Amino acid sequence: MSAAQILCLGEPLVEFNQTPEGQFAMGFGGDVSNVAISASRHGANAGLITRVGTDPFGAALCGLWTDEGVSTAHVTEAQGEETGVYFVTHDTDGHHFTYRRTGSAASRLAPDDLPLDALQSCPMFYASGISLAVSDSMRAAVVAAAEATRTAGGVFAFDPNLRVALWPLEVAREVTHSVMAACDIALPGLDDARQLTGLQPPEEIVRFYHDLGPRIVALTLGADGVLISVDGDMRTLPGHRVDAKDATGAGDCFNGAFLASLLDTQDPFAAAEHANMAAAISTTGYGAVAPIPTLSHTRSALNAAWQS
């Protein structure tokens, strides 16, 4: 496999989703894993930096990444440790998540685990707010990896991806703003950004993030599309009309498709157009991974949209 163009650091998870019959179907989760898979399906050489346990769940994740063309060269199989899992149950009040991730193999990732040579030769490094919230050691690893990539001339892309169940909002604000100040590409979602910044209008949020440091800000707006800005040149790309069933992982799909397209075209606006369509398509199926479209699927849908 060719050297990775995008290295993604975070915690992968195995999902057990309750079926209508009361059984649990196994699937895969973890935002950074989803981004790597989306980037790979959209033509980039993507790789993961993480740790999994020497258990059937870690083996299943490694098998998934191999099947998806995502490099596992920097995935450590930690002897005697466990892979994080979560359960999704359903009732009249909606979906409920139960996590079993405390002390997981991934949560023990630390700066000493980083493949510095690979990071220094990689054009792009990606992490999320969840990567920062999982543990203090993973947070330190994200900061060190971003510094290694940027010092060598690469770029750092970051999605603040807020999970208040993982850490208090005030702590999340302080840490994510600090990391955002050291990134080149900001990929926030509107709901998360409103909580983190205290601002409401999308344009004000974009200006806030530009002022922190990122040159490129792609603020995803859910079904309303994306507000993409390069050095303050803002353009809103409306959402695409689709038969949406499940928006799980749509933001991750956007991020992977955007970064892959940006590496290919070097045009943030074209990349946002491409990723906007990919994310829309991903909502037409169920789950985070299965509905992520391929490069050819996304291009065909874009061509059809332009011709209509």
Please tell me what each predicted stretch does.
Residues 10, 158-160, 188, 219, ...:
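Active-site flanking residues adjacent to catalytic metal/cofactor-binding acidic residues
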